């Protein structure tokens, strides 16, 4: 039995779950999410909790059991509280600006990099060097934050670039030169 998969998911107040066959939809104060569930995994609502069980002990059912439980738990957390990812921009002259759902990054290229956020993702900028990406879909949020970071990943010599808040960037020594 999967250690993660067998744990029940508590349902917060104001969150409703609708399960129709292999289609799951979760509604809450922040919005609603839908997901198609894989076969051989059964999701059931029992009062104020959601349980995830598997149909049989096949390899695919065992593989997906913990995954589906985590995905459903992330959906419930997302519609209840939402998720947030913070990125820091380091480097002389590097800065960001947000206008609506567009993010403009000035990170050392000849032209500013403009990114349009997908639907359901909000972006804010604090003091030109902190980008806050928020939304209810954890998977989409992580992918969006990774795309922003990929515009200028932190380099190991001076540490310039876009990094996640709290991310450790391993530094390298530069060339020592001949004397």
UniProtKB/Swiss-Prot annotation:
UniProt entry keywords in alphabetical sequence: Ribonucleoprotein, Ribosomal protein, RNA-binding, rRNA-binding
A GO term, aspect molecular function: structural constituent of ribosome
Cellular component GO terms held in the UniProt record: cytosolic large ribosomal subunit
InterPro entries: Ribosomal_uL6-like (IPR000702), Ribosomal_uL6-like_a/b-dom_sf (IPR036789), Ribosomal_uL6_a/b-dom (IPR020040), Ribosomal_uL6_bac-type (IPR019906), Ribosomal_uL6_CS (IPR002358)
Any GO BP: cytoplasmic translation
Disulfide bond residue pairs: none
This protein's record includes keyword Transmembrane helix: no
Keyword presence, Transmembrane: no
Family: Belongs to the universal ribosomal protein uL6 family.
Quaternary structure and interacting proteins, as annotated: Part of the 50S ribosomal subunit.
Role, per record: This protein binds to the 23S rRNA, and is important in its secondary structure. It is located near the subunit interface in the base of the L7/L12 stalk, and near the tRNA binding site of the peptidyltransferase center.
Protein name: Large ribosomal subunit protein uL6
The organism of origin for this protein: Synechocystis sp. (strain ATCC 27184 / PCC 6803 / Kazusa)
Taxonomy of the source species: Bacteria, Bacillati, Cyanobacteriota, Cyanophyceae, Synechococcales
């Amino acid at each position: 039995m999967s250690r993660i998969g067998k744990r029940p998911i508590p349902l917060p107040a104001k969150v409703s779950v609708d399960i129709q066959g292999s289609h799951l939809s979760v509604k809450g104060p922040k919005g609603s999410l839908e997901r198609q569930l894989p076969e051989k995994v059964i999701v059931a609502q029992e009062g104020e909790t959601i349980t995830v069980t598997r149909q049989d002990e096949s390899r695919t059912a065992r593989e997906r059991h913990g995954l589906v439980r985590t995905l459903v738990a992330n959906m419930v957390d997302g519609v209840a509280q939402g998720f947030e990812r913070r990125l820091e921009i380091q480097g002389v002259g590097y800065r960001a600006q947000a206008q609506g759902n567009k993010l403009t990054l000035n990170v050392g290229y000849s032209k500013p990099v403009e990114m349009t956020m997908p639907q359901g993702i909000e972006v804010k900028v604090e003091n030109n060097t902190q980008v806050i990406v928020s939304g209810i879909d954890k998977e989409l949020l992580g992918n969006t934050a990774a795309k922003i970071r990929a515009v200028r990943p932190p380099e190991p010599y001076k540490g310039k670039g876009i990094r996640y808040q709290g991310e450790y960037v391993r530094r390298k020594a530069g060339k020592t030169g001949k004397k």
